[in-house]
Amino acid sequence: MQTREQKLKLLNKTIETLWHGVSDTKEGDYPKIINLYKEVLKLNPKDKDAWENMIWLMWSMAINKKDTAWLFEAEKFAKMYLSINPNGYRAFEYVGQFYRIMMVDERLAIRYYESALRWKDAPETTFHSLTSLYLKRGDKIRAIGNCRFNLKRFPNDPYAKSKLKELTK
């Protein structure tokens, strides 16, 4: 009988071989890898990389197969990822990125990026993404406010400095 750690090691090695260990990923490999990630997450639901890679693969399948069912499946797992990993900025930022890039719902993306910024471990890039979203939606006031908030946490952030200067001309 394999231990939990041995099973995880074998699953991750299989994923690595299927996804990165061959020169060309074959038709049908992504669904196999997705299922392997689901097995990994049954054993280790806190594995943030597994969640993010699996969701990315589902999004990729939606594009490659032109099948929105994969995208809706990815959305379901993105929400599940956040519910299991609600502490820290990373899951909130990832779900924000999911809605910004994959589902293209800027309103929801903004909500999740704003939630990510409540955490002290949020990096400058999270602020940058949110500023960009505010500007894309035409909300200059919130973009300026976000730049100022960013500079309180990261006083030497060149992006925030230049963007704030540009916006307050």
Residue spans of the language-model regions?
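Terminal, low-structured helical/coil segments at or just beyond the last alpha-helical repeat
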Residues: 133-169
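N-terminal leader/linker segments that initiate helical-solenoid repeat arrays
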Residues: 1-31
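Short coil/turn linking the two alpha-helices of tandem helical-hairpin repeats
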Residues: 15-27, 55, 59-66, 96-104, ...
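Alpha-helical adaptor scaffolds
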Residues: 49-129
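A conserved position within tetratricopeptide repeats
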Residues: 41, 78-82, 117, 151, ...
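Amphipathic alpha-helices of TPR/Sel1-like and other helical repeat/solenoid scaffolds
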Residues: 3, 26-44, 70-85
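Start-of-helix signal in alpha-solenoid helical-repeat scaffolds, especially tetratricopeptide repeats
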Residues: 7-11, 30, 48, 71, ...
